[in-house]
Amino acid sequence: AIERLKHFVSREAFDIDGLGGKIVEQFYNEGILRDPTDIFTLEERNGGSGPTEDLFAVIDDKALHLERRDGWGKKSVENLFRAIRAKRRIELPRFIYALGIRQVGAATARLIARNYGSFRKFMTDMRNQDTERLLSIDGIGEAMAKDVVEFFKEEHNVSTVNRLLEEITVEDFVDNTNYNSPLSGKTVVFTGTLERMTRAEAKAKAQSLGAKVAGSVSAHTDYVIEGADAGSKAKKA
């Protein structure tokens, strides 16, 4: 469960400022976060930030009061809540990836989003075990389709998704890909530390230009983009 939460807030998923892996682990161990929906109820559960003089009110107060914790303050808590509120609208590819469906990486999530257009359409087909459209997507085979269907057959997963949809809005997919760019249809691999943008931003930019982003170099790789401290991928290329 804790790894699922870390995946949910990872860079290519919800990517919430101030809610990295260490904080997620701490909040999980203290029972503050148990599933992704808890992230979006944090502010409501936090309660007021002012001092309480009534001893009995303190005893009965079940609010989290994150600002009273070591290493936290009113400003840092406000920043966290602001970052969470900013992610109450999320792009469809990020949401699909954030669910942590087996074998569905960020690139595959984008392909699914592009083909289905809306999360409701995708979820309805998977709940009905209708994989015809899914299997028509280049790169998705029977094994992956089975894993996707199995995810939505698990009632706990469906319950979590439905609770999330009460808290957030998943935007329908808008294809802004430039299919006339020189990178359209090309396979690109990134390696090393990029100077002007994060790896996730670079991948998103390449995909918007019609490129396919791969995780490793192969015979199908057209371009390898090297940053600082490029590793084995650059040597292999």
Name every feature range the model reports, one short phrase each:
Residues 15-18, 189:
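Structured core elements
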Residues 1-16:
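Cys/His-rich short segments
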Residues 2-3, 26, 88:
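Intrinsically disordered, low-complexity segments enriched in polar/charged residues with Gly/Pro
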Residues 17, 21, 26, 30-68, ...:
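Compact, charge-rich alpha-helical regulatory domains located at protein termini
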Residues 8, 50-236:
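DNA strand-break repair and replication-stress modules
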